[in-house]
Design a protein with these regions (language model features):
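Terminal peptide-recognition signature
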Residues: 17, 21, 35-36, 54, ...
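C-terminal alpha-helix plus adjacent terminal tail
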Residues: 1-11, 165-170, 190, 194-197, ...
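Conserved CoA-thioester-binding segment of acyl-CoA-metabolizing enzymes
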Residues: 1-57
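Crotonase-fold acyl-CoA enzyme core
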Residues: 93-204
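Charged catalytic carboxylate motif
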Residues: 31-35, 87, 94, 191, ...
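A general structural signal for well-ordered alpha-helical segments in protein cores
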Residues: 88, 145, 154-157, 207-210, ...
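Glycine- (often His-adjacent) and acidic-residue-rich active-site loop
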Residues: 56-91, 110, 256
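Ligand-binding pocket scaffold of soluble enzyme catalytic domains
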Residues: 24, 28, 74, 168, ...
């Protein structure tokens, strides 16, 4: 597979998957989702690969699923939205189900679907510039992969999701347990590879089985069924389309995404950043 929107290389048993649409803050479009799937196939099949690291090119991890692509394609109705949401969900969950450890290396914005991808990884190492969030409800969209309440608890997840938090600081993310380590921005890749190489020194079969055991502690409580139920609810949101989402997209088409985001944010009182 020829990659256009990601870069993929393997060195010293570490597969490095780079989201590479820096002009679009590495937004996850359909092509990128296909390429992530292809790269994960390669990493899982290659016995030399022991750890997968995902990072963003430039100064962002990713702004999430590509709103500009939605704006241009104009999906409407349940039949059009169902395969879109299913693909989004399945790609994010590749990192949860991958038999090899997965690490998200995050700098800058890590939002919406990209935030969900980082949550699906086994570890997240973040630069001091990183920030996180789930802004979807502020413009009438739903949550594709509802992992957050499983990792931070229902009360905090409701706060972040209901309020459309999009500037959750790296320090707060560390306090909540969704970031493992904060490192200087200039050393993000080096620090992440150091952790990855530590994992590479452990018997891969042992790591695989232990990952299964840890994931099972949540799956046994119903995580996978709950995620599928939440995905079905998201389809109920996106299928008919909300008034806010339609207004947001109309402004984006007429004036651009920056104008639509300004309209979105102007409707809400400014809150202290966390």
């Amino acid at each position: 597979m020829d990659f256009e929107t990601i870069a993929f290389r393997v060195a010293d048993s570490v597969a490095l998957l780079t989201l590479s649409r820096p002009a679009r803050t590495n937004a996850l479009n359909d092509r990128m989702l296909q390429e992530i799937n292809g790269a994960m196939d390669l990493a899982e099949r290659d016995s030399a690969v022991r750890v997968v690291v995902v990072v963003g090119a430039g100064q962002a991890f990713s702004s999430g699923f590509d709103l500009k692509e939605q704006m241009e394609l104009r999906p409407t109705g349940f039949d059009q939205w169902k395969p879109i949401l299913r693909k989004d969900f399945d790609v994010v969950m590749r990192f949860w189900h991958c038999p090899k450890p997965t690490i998200a290396a995050v700098r800058g914005p890590c939002l919406a679907g990209a935030f969900e991808l980082s949550l699906a990884c086994d570890m997240t190492i973040a630069s001091e510039t990183a920030f996180f969030g789930e802004p979807e409800l502020k413009f009438g969209a739903g949550i594709v992969v509802m992992l957050l309440p499983w990792l931070v608890g229902a009360k905090i997840a409701k706060e972040i999701i209901f309020l459309g938090e999009d500037r959750l600081s790296v320090e707060r993310a560390r306090e909540l347990g969704i970031v493992n380590k904060i490192v200087p921005d200039a050393s993000l890749e080096a620090e992440t590879v150091l952790v990855a190489r530590h994992l590479c020194a452990i018997d891969p079969g042992l790591v695989k089985q232990t990952k299964r055991a840890i994931n099972y502690t949540l799956e046994r409580q119903g995580l996978l069924d709950a995620l599928e139920a939440a995905l079905a609810i998201d389809l109920d949101i996106e299928g008919p389309g909300s008034h806010d989402k339609m207004a947001f997209m109309d402004i984006a088409r007429a004036e651009g995404l920056k104008a639509a985001i300004a309209w979105r944010d102007a409707r809400f009182p400014e809150r202290r950043k966390k």
